[in-house]
Amino acid sequence: MQNQRNIILAVVLSLALILGWDLVMTRFFPPQVEAPVQTATQTVQGPSGEQIPADAPDLVRDLDAALASAGRIPIDAPEIAGSINPVGARVDDIVLKTHRTSVARDSGPIRLFAPHGTQRQHFARFDWVGQGVKVPDAQTEWTVTSGDRLTQETPVSLSWDNGQGQIFGLTFAIDEHYMLTVTQTLTNRATGSIAVRPRGIINRTSVGADRSTFNVHSGPIAALDNTVNFDWDYSEVTENNGQVNLPGRPDWVGFTDIYWMSALIPQPGLATQASFAEAGRDRYAAVLLYDTVTVPEGQMVTYTSRLFAGAKESNVLRAYEAEGVARFGLAIDWGWFRFIAWPMWWLLTHLFNLVGNFGLAIICLTIIVRAIMFPIAQKQFASMAAMRAVQPKMKALQERYKDDKPQLQQQMAKLYKDEKINPLAGCLPIFLQIPIFFALYKVLLLAIEMRHEPFYLWIKDLSAPDPAKILNLFGLLPFDPPGFLGIGVLAVILGLTMWLQFKLNPAAIDPVQQQIFMIMPWVLMFVMAPFAAGLLLYWITSNILTLGQQKYLYSKHPQLKAQAEKDAADRERAATRDKKA
């Protein structure tokens, strides 16, 4: 029992440190964000030394003014809306129709792409690199040749004549979700052949981007040679002389936030290179560059790339993966426990489809998890009962061999063998629950399906902390308590259920451990307060089920129940003596 208590204590303290560290650092030591300032026009190096225009803005542009520029081609698809700027053929205006900025009914849709020069600029464009050939650039004014609105049924085509015998073309198509197909053509009508390289670029600012942490990646992302690369963040690109040439063959490359992503996907079967580059102050580029192609006189070449710009919905990403976008489903960083997290997400979403509420789905998921763990819990209680039964023998051995530790260990091992006791059996449920807890934590943190999903009463968003804070009288006072001081109703219920759970257990032999386990529920109440309401709901439900499970198992092992009642009586007598003293 003492070893088990020590392990529990170590696990709980480790959880508190791991889960609480990032919250404290985010709250009290936020990264400094600098507003964009005027910069000089510059270029940066791409793969093989190709120049990437930095597209440096003059001053920060007003978003509405930028979107009011003439000639924009509207985008109207089932999941996204926006427009394409014919200047530079930039896809620079995308909002996500089905995802809102907040739970408020009048909140607007999430803006993913914004025009060049605006505070949150984020856009994509497709061009060519060539020596001795006039190629389109960021300032090229393209002509619309077909289509006046990009929809799922109607693609849009643009062209540009460089005046030297080459005609460049772009055709945009869009599907029912978040994928644009971009076809680049080049017709050579001049005398002699030319050599060019097709290219796609995503340019975005890091201002306002989600913060990359030890357990959630935000920033540059790429799939290379059968793996998804989460190694780089924005600052590391800057520290690497502003340039990262990615090794291997890219399946896709782009930028990710917690819920959103933009990515370039090359035409299958063609050799490409990928890189990340600093493209100005607080601005970065993801570049996809095809190998050089020679276009003979009178010939045309065609390249078809894809641009993903949307929400990281697991079903959608996996559907694209099934269509040939390798490892696209792994763009959601489920972490070390992906083998548990994804099945848990799958089960949670299917339970939601059955019950119609993600809070109820979490409760159902918790019941299923506890039911699966119940046989192990039975073995744990049986082990605890056996350990209690041999405790007098253990104490006798400890007294007899107190000066001979090797002999004591041998005799204890013999006692365990003779009594058929495994002292580690009681720890197994704890170790099994750690990956389950972290997997659910990742699911609630990363699954966009949970975003803005309500429960009942005051819980309007299960992916956000409990809004009913005690220190501001549940919202009556006009301030938001900081971090771990923002104790909500769910955190208090969590502390109470955990306290009851510890109270039902037989007391630890060590008085210091007894004190630690008395205060541990309230420590965890503060630590868990800033976490998602859905995670607290899971833990509360698990605690309540554990209380019922303990009651049942105590009926099967009356010696443990008697010991727990004796310990409780001893604690009450000790508390009474302390008060009198």
Describe each region flagged by the PLM:
Residues 72, 76-328:
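Soluble non-transmembrane domains of integral membrane proteins
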Residues 48-49, 148, 475:
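Intrinsic-disorder/low-complexity loop/linker signature
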Residues 8, 24, 57-60, 190, ...:
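Intrinsic disorder/low-complexity detector
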Residues 53-57, 152-156, 166-167, 507-511:
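Generic structural signal for short, solvent-exposed loop/turn connectors between secondary structure elements
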